[in-house]
Swiss-Prot record:
Disulfide bonds join 2-18, 9-23, 17-34. Expressed by the venom gland. This is Mu-thomitoxin-Hme1c. The presence of a 'disulfide through disulfide knot' structurally defines this protein as a knottin. May be interesting for the development of therapies to treat the periodic paralysis hypokalemic 2 (HOKPP2), since it inhibits I(GP) leak currents of HOKPP2 p.R222G/W channels. Coiled coil: none annotated. Keywords: Disulfide bond, Ion channel impairing toxin, Knottin, Neurotoxin, Secreted, Toxin, Voltage-gated sodium channel impairing toxin. The lineage of its organism: Eukaryota, Metazoa, Ecdysozoa, Arthropoda, Chelicerata. Gating-modifier toxin that inhibits mammalian and insect voltage-gated sodium channels. It shifts the voltage dependence of channel activation to more positive voltages. It shows potent activity on Nav1.4/SCN4A (IC(50)=103 nM), Nav1.5/SCN5A (IC(50)=268 nM) and Para/DmNav1 (IC(50)=555 nM) and lower activities on Nav1.2/SCN2A (IC(50)=1447 nM) and Nav1.6/SCN8A (IC(50)=3504 nM). GO terms for molecular function: sodium channel regulator activity; toxin activity. It comes from the Eukaryota. It is found in: Secreted. Belongs to the neurotoxin 07 (Beta/delta-agtx) family.
Length: 35
């Protein structure tokens, strides 16, 4: 299944973030997070 650790964005079976609609870039964490 889809796994998005620590709210990071993941792509699995045509969906981002285990069902989240989109992702945004977090400068503070230096990674993309689920929105």
């Amino acid at each position: 299944g889809c796994i998005a650790k620590n709210k990071e964005c993941a792509w699995f079976s045509g969906e981002w973030c285990c069902g989240a609609l989109s992702c945004k870039y977090s400068i503070k964490r230096n990674l993309k997070i689920c929105v």
